[in-house]
């Protein structure tokens, strides 16, 4: 059984088709990197996976459960059962480019919030879980009472990763998690993500970090103008690209 199956996703904005039949399958422990130029549809695809963007067609299955959908008035798909959507989203934790932490909550409360209010965990258990995952991403206890504005960008993104981990999801989705960081802070976030990959966590990430993608991925997808132009193992995609578009992309992005 796959941890995540996404089949034939289409997304349009008016007459502009951003995604044209993109599919992905992730088994337990897979790390799938999605690469491509800006505007290729990478982030839109990831947001369609957990219905932050509503696709116009396609199927999404997490484990043994397929998201039930119905046609919307504007040609998009809508969740047929909001409770099922919430349940599936809780199994698909997402880490965003711009952290998306709650500015009015402390670090600890940011991580505790969803386990308590979505998973209905006992608060004491949620606090213990939050502290466990904050320690896992290298944030000391003294940080937990601070607010996001008091942290560096790298620290904020590590809090966001701890928040995602606290949901103990089946799959973690990363949407360009380092692109908003100063260059000197990128390494600390990539180190945490590499540790997660080495633990066997199932991850789908959109990234511009080509060396990192080559190192940690089990599978790489090159997206171009809303379609999968090429995919394969890291050695195939980075070492022996078949598509001229992929060769051009790598020539401009490999460091």
Swiss-Prot record:
Record localization: Cell inner membrane
Superkingdom assignment: Bacteria
Chain segments annotated as coiled-coil in the UniProt record: none
Catalysed reactions, as listed in the record: a polar amino acid(out) + ATP + H2O = a polar amino acid(in) + ADP + phosphate + H(+); L-histidine(out) + ATP + H2O = L-histidine(in) + ADP + phosphate + H(+)
InterPro entries in alphabetical order: AAA+_ATPase, ABC_ATPase_HisP-typ, ABC_transporter-like_ATP-bd, ABC_transporter-like_CS, MetN_ABC_transporter-like, P-loop_NTPase
Gene Ontology terms: cellular component: plasma membrane
rRNA-binding in keyword set: no
Keyword Translocase: yes
Database matches in Gene3D superfamilies: P-loop containing nucleotide triphosphate hydrolases
Pfam families assigned to the protein according to its UniProt record, in alphabetical order: ABC_tran
Enzyme Commission no: 7.4.2.1
Any GO molecular function: ATP binding
Domain ABC transporter: 4-250
Binding site for ATP: 38-39, 41-44
Keywords: Amino-acid transport, ATP-binding, Cell inner membrane, Cell membrane, Membrane, Nucleotide-binding, Translocase, Transport
Membrane topology value: Peripheral membrane protein
Primary role: Part of the ABC transporter complex HisPMQJ involved in histidine transport. Shows ATPase activity. Responsible for energy coupling to the transport system.
UniProt similarity note: Belongs to the ABC transporter superfamily.
Known partners and oligomeric status: The HisPMQJ complex is composed of two ATP-binding proteins (HisP), two transmembrane proteins (HisM and HisQ) and a solute-binding protein (HisJ).
PANTHER family: AMINO ACID IMPORT ATP-BINDING PROTEIN (PTHR43166), HISTIDINE TRANSPORT ATP-BINDING PROTEIN HISP (PTHR43166:SF15)
Protein name (record): Histidine transport ATP-binding protein HisP
Organism: Pseudomonas aeruginosa (strain ATCC 15692 / DSM 22644 / CIP 104116 / JCM 14847 / LMG 12228 / 1C / PRS 101 / PAO1)
Lineage: Bacteria, Pseudomonadati, Pseudomonadota, Gammaproteobacteria, Pseudomonadales
């Amino acid at each position: 059984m796959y941890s995540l199956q996404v089949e034939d996703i289409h997304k349009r904005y008016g007459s502009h088709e951003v995604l044209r039949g993109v599919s992905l399958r992730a088994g337990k422990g897979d790390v799938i990197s999605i690469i491509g130029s800006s505007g290729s549809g990478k982030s839109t695809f990831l947001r369609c996976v957990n219905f932050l963007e509503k696709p116009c067609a396609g199927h999404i299955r997490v484990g043994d459960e397929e998201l039930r959908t119905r046609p919307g008035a504007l040609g998009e798909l809508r969740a047929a059962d909001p409770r099922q959507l919430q349940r599936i989203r809780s199994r698909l934790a997402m880490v965003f480019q711009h952290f998306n932490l709650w500015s009015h909550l402390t670090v600890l409360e940011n991580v505790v919030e969803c386990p308590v209010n979505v998973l209905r965990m006992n608060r004491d258990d949620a606090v213990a879980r939050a502290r466990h995952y904050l320690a896992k991403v290298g944030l000391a206890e003294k940080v937990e009472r601070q607010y996001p504005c008091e942290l560096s960008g790298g620290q904020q993104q590590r809090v966001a990763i701890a928040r995602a981990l606290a949901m103990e999801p089946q799959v973690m989705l990363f949407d360009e998690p380092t692109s908003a960081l100063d260059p000197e802070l990128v390494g600390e976030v990539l180190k945490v993500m590499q540790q997660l990959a080495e633990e066997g966590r199932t991850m789908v990430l959109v990234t511009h970090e080509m060396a990192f993608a080559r190192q940690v991925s089990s599978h790489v997808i090159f997206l171009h103008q809303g379609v999968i132009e090429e995919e394969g193992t890291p050695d195939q995609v980075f070492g022996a690209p078949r598509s001229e578009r992929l060769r051009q992309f790598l020539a401009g992005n490999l460091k």
